[in-house]
Amino acid sequence: MSQGLSFVFELLGACFIGLVAAVCMTIFELPFWKKWGIEGVAEWQVNSVIVSMLIRKFSNRRVSISMSVGMHLLHGAALGIVFRVLLTLLGTAIPASSILTYAIVYSGVLWIISPFLSRSLFERAGGFRMTERGVAVSFLAHNVYGFSLGLLIPVLA
């Protein structure tokens, strides 16, 4: 198989692994959502705003929780690809233990970007306030995503 085609299959695998990691993250978030509603999970609020901005051009429908979670899973899959590309840029002979560390750092950077740094932007656009506990749950959930991603990405090698 050509090297280019092999890399495409690796990216598809990374997409799937990103999706699985996002599912793990979502499973972690479910009890907080059940207890506190959408305010208990900051990235679901962020995704709700994104979905709202996308669908309001085509529909008057309100954003449902399933739409928000769907966008959340889509982001997880896409960010799995981004992580794999970043690993490729760092070099090919990275030990699995280092990949786990890189994945946790990567998920921390993702959390810093959204929801932490972009918090006020999404609050204004969505007309809501992110709670401290929702942001804290988001931080923990991003670590679950990074840990899952870091454990699964070496399977592609």
Stretch-by-stretch model annotation:
Residues M1-A157:
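Juxtamembrane/disordered regions of integral membrane proteins
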